[in-house]
């Protein structure tokens, strides 16, 4: 603890703020509660349907075997067999958002941990600085920034996923593999809304999305990828 009596807590002399800072300090590298809240806020702005439109889901289901055949013609029999055995799930934007946050949670945790570690150049720059004897206000701001970083990162990631959920056609708008590996996610209502906005035939748009998603799924299932 420094001479000012605050230690690592800039609000050590104020009980209410001190308790709040302790809670923030124990939230880990990324605050997932805030990330989920901001993601849900992003998907709720459009006032979408609580469930997938059955007609849109059935229309996609009928095209899946044809899309599997076309992808198999290019990528081979092994890819066609894998896609024919895959499980296909149909989500609303809000459901896609929740699934994506859970699927990429380990990745975002690793990112947050890496961002929270000082680089070699930054660490070297502070080698000769005695933090205990530095300016109290500067020390307080450094501690406050480190405590707020998980919440701010949670806001950023939650807002990003929430906005992406409003436009995503499937799980490979972000070209990253995700678990479970044998599942393909599709967002029928968003696909149809896009086709309607651009005056495109719905069947053509659905087939394009299916081929894009199935091709990405088949490639990312290759072990060396």
Task: Cite the ranges covered by each PLM segment.
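Auxiliary, metal-adjacent structural segments of Zn-dependent hydrolase domains
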Residues: 60-189
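Extreme N-terminal leader/anchor segments
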Residues: 16, 22, 26, 30-33, ...
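Short pre-active-site segment immediately N-terminal to the catalytic Zn-binding motif
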Residues: 191-209
């Amino acid at each position: 603890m420094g001479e000012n009596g605050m230690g690592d807590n800039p609000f050590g002399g104020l009980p209410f703020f001190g308790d709040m800072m302790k809670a923030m300090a124990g939230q880990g590298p990324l605050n997932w509660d805030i990330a989920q809240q901001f993601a849900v806020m992003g998907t709720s702005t459009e006032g979408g349907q609580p469930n997938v439109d059955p007609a849109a889901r059935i229309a996609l289901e009928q095209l899946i075997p044809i899309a599997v055949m076309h992808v198999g013609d290019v990528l081979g029999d092994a890819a066609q067999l894998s896609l024919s055995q895959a499980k296909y799930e149909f989500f609303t934007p809000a459901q896609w958002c929740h699934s994506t946050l859970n699927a990429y949670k380990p990745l975002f945790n690793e990112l947050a941990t890496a961002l929270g570690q000082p680089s070699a150049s930054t660490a070297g720059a502070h080698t000769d600085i005695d933090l205990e004897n530095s300016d109290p206000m500067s020390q307080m701001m450094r501690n406050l920034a480190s405590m707020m970083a998980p919440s701010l990162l949670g806001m950023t990631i939650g807002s990003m996923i929430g906005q992406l959920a409003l436009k995503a056609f499937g799980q490979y708008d972000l070209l990253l593999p995700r678990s479970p590996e044998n599942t393909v996610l599709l967002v029928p209502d968003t696909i149809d809304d896009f086709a309607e906005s651009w005056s495109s035939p719905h069947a053509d748009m659905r087939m394009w999305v299916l081929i894009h998603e199935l091709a990405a799924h088949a490639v990312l299932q290759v072990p060396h990828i």
